[in-house]
């Protein structure tokens, strides 16, 4: 139980710090006017690897894959900035993934609404 609680606290702290870094410290002109939200962080048992799920609201003509590639290419810099803001013995290696739960939730809501209103 103690280990799960620590893992939960560390993943929440990493989530906050990475959100801050992406919004305010990552100066990539391709990411301007794109809202990137960190949904969740999954850590490995030894905290050496972190899978970061991001939701992307995009009003430019750039695909999710390209945005994830930009984030993945910036992961070493993000990890460096994370190390400055969080005090861990090992700063995890970052891997960015697209969180499609919002899109899936919207599809399910639309399906439910279609069934309810088309009786």
Swiss-Prot record:
PROSITE patterns given in the database record: RBFA
Gene Ontology CC, one term: cytosol
Alphabetical list of Pfam families matching this protein: RBFA (PF02033)
GO biological process: maturation of SSU-rRNA
Gene Ontology molecular function: any one: ribosomal small subunit binding
Keywords assigned by UniProt, alphabetized: Cytoplasm, Ribosome biogenesis
Major location (coarse): cytoplasm
Family matches, as InterPro entries: KH_dom-like_a/b, RbfA, RbfA_dom_sf, Ribosome-bd_factorA_CS
Family: Belongs to the RbfA family.
Subunit and partners: Monomer. Binds 30S ribosomal subunits, but not 50S ribosomal subunits or 70S ribosomes.
Protein function: One of several proteins that assist in the late maturation steps of the functional core of the 30S ribosomal subunit. Associates with free 30S ribosomal subunits (but not with 30S subunits that are part of 70S ribosomes or polysomes). Required for efficient processing of 16S rRNA. May interact with the 5'-terminal helix region of 16S rRNA.
Designated name of the protein: Ribosome-binding factor A
